[in-house]
Amino acid sequence: MSPEVTLNRISPALSPFISSVVRNGNVGLDSTSCLRITDLKSGCTSLTPGPSCDRFKLHIPYAGETLKWDIIFNATYPELPPDFIFGEDAEFLPDPSALHNLAEWNPSDPECLLLVVKELVQQYHQYQCSRLSESSRLMFEYQTLQEEPQYGENMEIYAGKKNNWTGEFSARFLLKLPVDFSNIPIYLLKDSNEDPGEDVALLSVSFEDAEATQVFPKLFLSPRIEHALGGSSALHIPAFPSGSCLIDYVPQVCQLLTNKVQYVIQGYHKRREYIAAFLSHFGTGVVEYDAEGFTKLTLLLSWKDFCFLVHIDLPLYFPRDQPTLTFQSVYHFTNSGQLYSQAQKNYPYSPRWDGNEMAKRAKAYFRSFVPQFQEAAFANGKL
């Protein structure tokens, strides 16, 4: 249900509280998932005019789960705070003395409901952490992470019995990884949603039993970061090693991700250096180039009155990954009507060369390759 539809059904006196929740309702680590409202109902009589819904179910993303709490207002007395029913979490009993925004409910503040929800989620986190005491191994995982502020302050935990018949215990840890994305080139981040939220990496680690014999990690990247690093298939985290623990595994994933970010940043600056060197070496032979991401360059060259184009595609992880050179005749066509071309990746290359050395080596390779390309164009293409 869209925020607009939700607000149109809410009692007008309660609408400011609900608007703040559905429009600004980010709680917890996952900034890409907002609070949602469903199951709108009214406690008013059927004679009450206009929109009168004053109770609903609030969906809260938490540690890879979705908490579903019922919130019950009284539209007849909208100045009163709501009641809460915590659904399947019947054992969750919040400490009223820690719910300051509920005890000091301020109906003139549109954010008062959102503030109470945040306080409740904090207490819910403490409740879940306390449940880990059923497993000494999982409690060890929690305590060692908690001792490191960079992890302990950015962690959500969901624990419980996976199987009520066997009593088997399981838990999921969700951690916001302390990785700096601020230096990723802007052009890689612009193709995103209108409101992409925070750039974040979340690591979910599920323990399917109390002794940690089955552990399944999974990495979640916010949309802009996933796009900047080359898509969902570009980053594979290692399996959780047998006998390992989170305090050893999490830094490994952080380092892996940090290295990927550095490769992308380095690739951007190296591509810019590469294209600058080609502009210097080939001058007026440069037809066009990508002046934003420095990912493409096209040259118009000639050899013994044979003119040809060279399209150079520089990959995201350049210079680790080698550029592709595509030679294209300006005279010859294929049967499908396209200019005859050949792509080459088997040419002298070293990621350790600077841009100037790469340009010099490329020029030498062009001279050595163009005779056979010309011959192939005449043999396989049509004028």
UniProtKB/Swiss-Prot annotation:
InterPro entries, per database record: BRE
Region (UEV-like 2): 275-364
GO molecular function: polyubiquitin modification-dependent protein binding
Keyword field: Apoptosis, Cell cycle, Cell division, Chromatin regulator, Cytoplasm, DNA damage, DNA repair, Mitosis, Nucleus, Repeat, Ubl conjugation pathway
CDD domains documented for this protein: BRE
Residue span of region UEV-like 1: 30-147
Principal subcellular localization: cytoplasm
Example GO BP: double-strand break repair
One GO cellular component term noted in the UniProt record for this chain: cytoplasm
Record's subcellular location: Cytoplasm; Nucleus
Family membership noted in the UniProt record: Belongs to the BABAM2 family.
Oligomeric and partner information: Component of the ARISC complex, at least composed of uimc1/rap80, abraxas1, brcc3/brcc36, babam2 and babam1/nba1. Component of the BRCA1-A complex, at least composed of brca1, bard1, uimc1/rap80, abraxas1, brcc3/brcc36, babam2 and babam1/nba1. In the BRCA1-A complex, interacts directly with abraxas1, brcc3/brcc36 and babam1/nba1. Binds polyubiquitin. Component of the BRISC complex, at least composed of abraxas2, brcc3/brcc36, babam2 and babam1/nba1.
Free-text note regarding domains: Contains 2 ubiquitin-conjugating enzyme family-like (UEV-like) regions. These regions lack the critical Cys residues required for ubiquitination but retain the ability to bind ubiquitin.
UniProt-recorded name of the protein: BRISC and BRCA1-A complex member 2
